[in-house]
C-alpha cells in the first residue's frame, strides 16, 4: 500500500515537472491550456459550478421576495 502511494506520488511529480518544463510563451497560454485539458474535465467542473451556484441563486431569490 505504502509503496503504491509512493509510486503514484512520484509519477504525479514527474508529470508536473514535465508539464512545467514545456511551458508555453505568455501569448499562447490560453490555447495551450485548452489543448492540454480535455473537454470532459471542463464540462465536469462546469457542472460543479452550476451545482454550487444553485443555492446562492435560491437564497438571493428568497431574500428579494421577502
Curated annotation (Swiss-Prot):
Gene: cox8
Keywords: Membrane, Mitochondrion, Mitochondrion inner membrane, Oxidoreductase, Transit peptide, Transmembrane, Transmembrane helix
Keyword Aminoacyl-tRNA synthetase: no
Gene3D superfamilies reported in the protein's UniProt record: Cytochrome c oxidase subunit VIIc (4.10.49.10)
Ranges that cross the membrane: 39-59
Membrane topology listed for this record: Single-pass membrane protein
Residue spans, topological domain Mitochondrial intermembrane: 60-66
Name of this protein: Cytochrome c oxidase polypeptide VIII, mitochondrial
A Pfam family: COX7C
Keyword Nucleotidyltransferase in record: no
MF GO annotations: oxidoreductase activity
Organism of provenance: Schizosaccharomyces pombe (strain 972 / ATCC 24843)
Amino acid at each position: 500500500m505504502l509503496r503504491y502511494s509512493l509510486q503514484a506520488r512520484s509519477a504525479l511529480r514527474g508529470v508536473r515537472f514535465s508539464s512545467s518544463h514545456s511551458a508555453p510563451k505568455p501569448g499562447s497560454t490560453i490555447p495551450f491550456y485548452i489543448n492540454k485539458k480535455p473537454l470532459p474535465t471542463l464540462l465536469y467542473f462546469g457542472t460543479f459550478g452550476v451545482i454550487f451556484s444553485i443555492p446562492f441563486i435560491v437564497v438571493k431569490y428568497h431574500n428579494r421576495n421577502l
